[in-house]
Amino acid sequence: MSGHKKRVYPEAQYQYGAQPAAPSQGFPPGPAMSPPMQAQQFLTPAQQQLHQQIDQATSSMGNMNLHNVPVVDPSTFYQAGVASPPVAPHAVAGTQYNEQPYGHMSIGKPMNQLYPIDLFQELPPPITDLSLPPPPLLVPAERIVVPSEEANASPDYLRCTLNAIPKTNGLLKKSKLPLAMVIRPYLHLEDSIDPPPLNMDGCIVRCRRCRSYINPFVTFLEGGRRWRCNFCNLANDVPQAFDMDMQGVPINRYDRNEIQRAVVEYLAPKEYAVRQPPPSCYAFVFDVSQNAIKNGLLATAARTLLESLDSLPNYDERTRITILAVDHTIHYFSVPLDEEGDHIRMMDVVDLDEPFLPMPDTMFVSLKDCRNNLEKLLSQIPDIFQSNILPKFALGPALKAAHNLIKGIGGKIIVVSATLPNIGIGKLNKRNEASVANTSKEASQLLSCGDSFYKNFTIDCNKTQVTIDMFLASDDYVDFASVSNLGRYTGGQTHFYPGFTALNMIDVTKFSKEFSKHITMDLSMEAVMRARGSTGLRMSRFYGHFFNRSSDLCAFPTFPRDQSYVFEISIDEQIVRDYVYLQIAVLLSQNTGQRRIRVITVCIPTTDSLAEVYASADQLAMTVYHSQKAIEKVMSSGFEDAREYLDRSVQEVLATYKKEIAMSNTAGGAPLRLCANLRMWPLLMHSLTKHMAFRSGIIPADHRAAALNALESLPLPYFIKNIYPSVYSLHDMPDEAGLPNENGEIVLPQPINATSSLFERYGLYLLDTGMDMFLWLGGDAVPELVMDVFGTQDIMQIQVGKGELPILENSEFNERVRNVIVKLREHDDIITYPTLHIVRGASPSEPMNHASAREVASLRLWATSQLVEDKVQSSFTYREFLQSMKTKTSK
């Protein structure tokens, strides 16, 4: 940030291809594009849409083309929780049709309108759509007790695949669209960040029949003495306490949080708990076998835990910790109270079949009372085992031992391992990948659970409120597919660090940051989550990391803050009402010693119009749902069936739209028609087939299993980025990009499409998958650009692979690029810290057999596999995929 003069890179001297469009010009403007009206910026999204409806009605009545169109006051409608209005598609070059809403639409209540588009005319696809909110939930004011922007749940918490619910199961099946919701009850790793309002008076009003919680969409009856449940229609009495505060002073019930807001939290009274909320409890199981010593994992994990002790959740100072070291033996540590001395004893148990607990009272200890001795132990553990050459790792017996220590209270078992479990119960063998990789037997033989222990043990853990998290860091096979079941069924997670070595500070930084954020996120225990639907709706399938205790109850020994869930919904009977309701309730014990209930409610309009169903479909939520079904297909019938399922789902929707909507409402010739709110959905579905979780080809089993595991639980924004990476052109980014704005926030450049057709051979690009970043430097980049970014003019001197950019004091551009990377790594809602991989593009001047040729080729292949609009191995480009869909739907 010195007085360094901005450099203009002379890219024009290279003639390898057309200059890519600036990020704000993702595709050329068409003749039909018009500037937005300035007045609209002062309207709410609902008001803006309704103004458009009124304009259309007024214009039509003036022309005597439409009759009996009601004039609606736009101020009587609220669209809660959505920041932007429904966006009509931008006209693009070559568009030959008039984009007007069409189809059979409801009269008398506001609904989203259908805007037709031609998918071929939308190429390259407008990726800014990926950051748009879903189609709005338009709910009239008379449906809400106290109309407000917070009366309906934000899509950050809950997104339904359809924001207009079909009134019959027949219409749902006819649409070929899924009905499900994507749920994320907690939005941050720490509960103190932007919490919902908390009711502390102990007055929790619920329907006595369906047990739903009172919410902004109920109806008060008989002068306010009773309320009608909007879920089952039962009239309930209003308790006297509802109109009083905690001191018994009368209050206005319409000011209550649960009446004004869709997301609210209650301090639960004692009848919601079977015991006193337990303390936060952690059992750390450290692999101390040869692999963990050799790659430095043990030392890294011990040091990170030591440095994180101050940040462990310990609000009530009741947090307890135990540490086990494991090779072929279970090593317990007896840690005395600080006031009783500092003599720490290590006790070894070699009987793996029936491990006993020597002196359990001194092994599961208070963080507050034993803090100094815990620090001493963590600093000594790497030295104690530094000479260990034993290759055995008894994971199963260690888990049972840790479970025995904490089962009386519950909590987390956190395993840090570099070795395949190879002794004792749960022993696993290396699988023969070469013979079945990329065949029909791959899923059944490489991704199935190798030992029933890893599923059966989770039943015991759920009974005793114990979650298991795994951190696997190795350059060898660890059978991710088997051990990840431990977290999958206990509300936990499995994290994977292939090729980890403490000799590489990039690996150390990634592991340390993620491990630290994981163990310091807020811990809630004894959690259950239940979803309710109003009459006609039923939760039928559940996807995510939890234990499905009953038909509609999901159990979590501890509740994570960085995962999401998918619930499939069935329509069991004809819906007669104009609106339906969904409600999520999470009951848990916080580490503050409080029992709390978080309630999330959403109101969704219903329809008997197929056009309105399509106009309200949420393309991002649909993609998440289909990924869960595809994962099911992988495990039941293999990868080929999963890819066919994804392609067939797109084909069926396109065919249905063509037959039921487009053909009956338009004349002439768009080659491949769909509605604007779904125009990115075929791209996302096609991108899924190219993801490591599903694509064909020889992929190491651990990597494949880890990719599937991530898709099971990633929150929606990170899920979308993982399957369709964000790509930024840096060498020509706007002047303000990479610098702080007036609020101190780093400005990011606009992303470009994930295709190599926009890459120049002299350019600098950043690809961000949320898990990894690739900084791609064109092989023919000018020396000035190379110098400004890397501090050298010789492109061959740049170290490729995992790395970080050097800090160049006199290069503003270097600082701007680093700022962009830092900004993309900033998260308070997920633990992931993406590794940066520096990739050098090909060049005719590149030496044939330079020292890093093999590594560079591998990196290029990995990076270009993220450009999902291109061919990835034998797959179609996105244009070819659309052409194949056109052919199939024309038959």
Swiss-Prot record:
InterPro entries on file: ADF-H/Gelsolin-like_dom_sf (IPR029006), Gelsolin-like_dom (IPR007123), Gelsolin-like_dom_sf (IPR036180), Sec23/24_helical_dom (IPR006900), Sec23/24_helical_dom_sf (IPR036175), Sec23/24_trunk_dom (IPR006896), Sec23_24_beta_S (IPR012990), SEC23_SEC24_subfamily (IPR050550)
A Pfam family matched in the record: Sec23_trunk
Gene3D superfamilies linked to this entry: beta-sandwich domain of Sec23/24, Sec23/Sec24 helical domain, Severin, von Willebrand factor, type A domain, Zn-finger domain of Sec23/24
Listed GO biological process terms: COPII-coated vesicle cargo loading; intracellular protein transport; macroautophagy; positive regulation of ER to Golgi vesicle-mediated transport; positive regulation of protein exit from endoplasmic reticulum
SUPFAM superfamilies: beta-sandwich domain of Sec23/24, C-terminal, gelsolin-like domain of Sec23/24, Helical domain of Sec23/24, vWA-like, Zn-finger domain of Sec23/24
Keywords: Cytoplasm, Cytoplasmic vesicle, Endoplasmic reticulum, ER-Golgi transport, Golgi apparatus, Membrane, Metal-binding, Protein transport, Transport, Zinc
Membrane topology: Peripheral membrane protein
Location (main, coarse): cytoplasm
Chain spans, region Zinc finger-like: 207-232
Compartment annotation: Cytoplasm; Cytoplasmic vesicle, COPII-coated vesicle membrane; Endoplasmic reticulum membrane; Golgi apparatus membrane
Amino acids binding Zn(2+): 207, 210, 229, 232
GO CC annotation, single: COPII vesicle coat
MF-aspect GO terms: signal sequence binding; SNARE binding; zinc ion binding
Family per record: Belongs to the SEC23/SEC24 family. SEC24 subfamily.
Assembly and oligomerization: The COPII coat is composed of at least 5 proteins: the SEC23/24 complex, the SEC13/31 complex, and the protein SAR1. Golgi apparatus membrane; Peripheral membrane protein; Cytoplasmic side.
PANTHER family: SEC24-RELATED PROTEIN, SECRETORY 24AB, ISOFORM A
Function: Component of the coat protein complex II (COPII) which promotes the formation of transport vesicles from the endoplasmic reticulum (ER). The coat has two main functions, the physical deformation of the endoplasmic reticulum membrane into vesicles and the selection of cargo molecules.
Name of this chain's protein: Protein transport protein SEC24
Species annotation: Eremothecium gossypii (strain ATCC 10895 / CBS 109.51 / FGSC 9923 / NRRL Y-1056)
